[in-house]
């Protein structure tokens, strides 16, 4: 008889493992390409970041850093996942529908993909491999 890891892992475990991998990879991507560069080049980001809602460049950069770093880390850990992912979605959707509304599909692609990823995470939750599950069993 052949040993098969596929038969050992249940469908529910596959879903939870898939959610973990999706969360970690999505967060790695947004941290690497958006969060850390904004934080490490704060002064430059302050000058160049758009202010789509007219709340001021300072608020916009702090909100972008908050969502792209703090909320992203919460999503990766699976802590307050839906809440944190929702904040990320507010940023990505404002990028898609306000900042890049007149740009080409190639430019709109990035906020669209992030919106889909974090929308899915908001809908599905963190899964079993998360701090949400450990602390709250949901």
Which residues make up each language-model segment?
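Extended, low-polarity transmembrane helix blocks
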Residues: 1-40, 58-66, 70, 77-138
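Perimembrane loop-to-helix junctions flanking transmembrane segments
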Residues: 45-58
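A general structural signal for well-ordered alpha-helical packing
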Residues: 46, 70-73
């Amino acid at each position: 008889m052949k040993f098969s890891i596929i038969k050992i892992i249940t469908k529910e475990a596959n879903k939870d493992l898939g959610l973990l991998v999706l969360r970690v990879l999505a967060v790695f991507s947004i941290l690497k390409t958006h969060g850390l560069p904004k934080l490490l080049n704060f002064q430059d980001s302050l000058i160049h970041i758009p202010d789509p809602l007219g709340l001021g460049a300072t608020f916009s950069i702090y909100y972008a850093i908050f969502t792209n770093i703090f909320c992203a880390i919460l999503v990766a850990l699976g802590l307050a996942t839906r809440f944190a992912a929702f904040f990320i979605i507010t940023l990505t959707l404002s990028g898609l529908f306000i900042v890049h509304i007149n740009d080409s599909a190639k430019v709109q692609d990035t906020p669209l993909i992030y919106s889909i990823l974090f929308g899915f995470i908001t809908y599905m939750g963190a899964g079993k491999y998360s701090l949400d599950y450990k602390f709250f069993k949901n």
